[in-house]
């Protein structure tokens, strides 16, 4: 299990117990200067007070469990309008929306793809790129995915 998966599994019961969806978790930066981002959401959206409540509970849990070596900053926020895509089900949930992908390696000559998300087809994400070409990108090649606000 990766460190991100471990963190997600550790945090999800606390976040859902508070009445929020744990959208995803990111751990960025180098050792000693890391940031743990915890994205939460509800159907009604997220307010500052929601982030504070989750931050307080998650911070206590992380202090006890100590799953991250060294110092780090904790950030709790809504996923925002340019929402990151963490879960396979979100590729169907946001079908029809504009998306941008960063790939782990070249796929059909590119590492970045922008276009309209067409959904998930088994282990492939379907995207109609800006040139109108439909791509089937293996899920395992996607490093990062976000909804795209740019027209």
From Swiss-Prot:
Keywords linked to the UniProt accession: Cytoplasm, Ribosome biogenesis
SUPFAM superfamilies noted in UniProt: YhbC-like, C-terminal domain, YhbC-like, N-terminal domain
Q: Name one GO biological process term.
A: ribosomal small subunit assembly
GO CC annotations on file = cytosol
Indicate where this protein resides in the cell.
Cytoplasm
Keyword Amino-acid biosynthesis belongs to the record: no
* Pfam families linked to this entry: DUF150_C, RimP_N
Lineage, top-rank taxon, reads Bacteria
Q: What HAMAP family does this protein's entry cite?
A: RimP (MF_01077)
What function is annotated for this protein?
Answer: Required for maturation of 30S ribosomal subunits.
The entry assigns this protein to a family as follows: Belongs to the RimP family.
Protein name listed in UniProt: Ribosome maturation factor RimP
- Tell me which species this is from: Halorhodospira halophila (strain DSM 244 / SL1)
Q: Supply the source organism's classification.
A: Bacteria, Pseudomonadati, Pseudomonadota, Gammaproteobacteria, Chromatiales
């Amino acid at each position: 299990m990766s460190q991100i998966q471990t963190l997600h599994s550790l945090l999800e019961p606390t976040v859902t117990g508070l009445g929020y969806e744990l959208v995803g978790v990111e751990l960025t930066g180098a050792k000693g200067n890391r940031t743990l981002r915890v994205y939460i959401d509800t159907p009604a959206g997220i307010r500052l007070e929601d982030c504070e409540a989750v931050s307080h509970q998650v911070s206590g849990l992380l202090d006890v469990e100590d799953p991250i070596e060294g110092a780090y900053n904790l950030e709790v926020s809504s996923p925002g309008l340019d929402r990151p895509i963490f879960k396979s089900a979100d590729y169907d949930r946001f079908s029809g929306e504009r998306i941008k992908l960063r790939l782990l390696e070249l796929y059909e000559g590119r590492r970045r793809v922008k276009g309209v998300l067409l959904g998930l087809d088994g282990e492939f994400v379907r995207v109609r790129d800006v040139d109108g070409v439909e791509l089937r990108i293996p899920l395992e090649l996607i490093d990062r995915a976000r909804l795209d606000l740019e027209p």
